[in-house]
Regions:
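Short, hydrophobic/glycine-enriched beta-strand segments
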Residues: 2-8
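Active-site glycine-centered loops adjacent to acidic/histidine catalytic or metal-binding residues
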Residues: 8, 83, 181
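Glycine-rich N-terminal loop/short-helix segment of MobA-like nucleotidyltransferase
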Residues: 10-25
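Short catalytic helix/loop segments, enriched in acidic residues and glycine
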Residues: 21-38
Length: 246
């Protein structure tokens, strides 16, 4: 069985280096191209997909749709879960990461971005950016709406989905694609690979590059990004540097 994890293509706020979280921004032209390339990579590898799951945010949904059209997967069969949404960045949402580093320091921004259990400053329930003010999130129980999450919080939010999902795909066998976000995918990797709190802080997932994980009897027996190692390291370094002063 193969599990393919794919971070959405470049979004408008990836391009402008802003904390995005639950803000529902669109893909850039490059992001669309990245999604197309990802779909073609799956074709080249002859990986047929049995299920596709994604979040309820447009940048992930549209990436999933682009990929599905390329690999001839029925778009109407794409399943969505809010639990796969990006980490909610609280009051940081909309702020430029480099400018935020100038104000609070690179160390603090790194803690907000990459620590396991330290959340960003939370937004107030009366804040206009609170998720309860957006129609897209109306079906989510208000008690579950985040106001600012650490990666630990994302894992707690994700686990009800994950426990059902891993059971489903194990029973089905075959190959399965999750199109989601940097931190929801990092949460999955922490659970799946049993990474320590420290190990997960150095995991950087580039946009639009499929990560193929081969699983046998609930054990990982192989994994690879569908990109050459040199290009992968360049992209991962770019992500690591996003919170630095420029």
């Amino acid at each position: 069985m193969k599990l393919i994890l794919l971070r959405h293509g470049e979004s408008e706020w990836n391009l402008s280096n802003q904390f995005t979280g639950w803000v529902d921004v669109n893909l850039t032209d490059l992001g669309i191209q990245e999604a197309q390339i990802a779909g073609n990579k799956l074709l080249e590898e002859k990986i047929s997909i049995n299920t596709i799951y994604t979040s309820i945010l447009n940048r992930a949904i549209n990436t999933a749709k682009i990929v599905s059209n390329i690999i001839s997967f029925n778009e109407s069969c794409i399943k969505k879960s809010w639990r796969l949404n990006e980490r909610h960045y609280g009051k940081l949402q909309g702020l430029n990461k480099s400018q935020t580093a100038k104000i609070y320091g690179e160390k603090q921004v790194h803690i907000w971005r990459r620590s396991f259990d330290i959340p960003p400053p939370k937004i107030h329930i009366k804040d206009k950016m609170h998720p309860s003010n957006f129609k897209k999130f109306a079906k989510i129980d208000k008690i579950n709406l985040p106001t600012g999450e650490s990666l630990s919080d994302v894992i707690i939010r994700l686990k009800p989905f994950w426990n059902n999902y891993i059971k489903e795909i194990t029973e089905l066998g075959g190959n399965h694609l999750i199109v989601a976000h940097s931190n929801s995918l990092r949460a999955i990797l922490k659970i799946l690979k049993n990474l320590t709190d420290k190990e997960i802080t150095s995991v950087n997932i580039p946009t639009g590059i499929p990560l193929v994980i081969e699983i046998d009897k609930n054990k990982i027996i192989g994994e690879k990004y569908l990109i050459d190692e040199t290009s992968l390291k360049v992209k991962q370094k770019q992500i690591a540097n996003q919170g630095k002063i420029k």
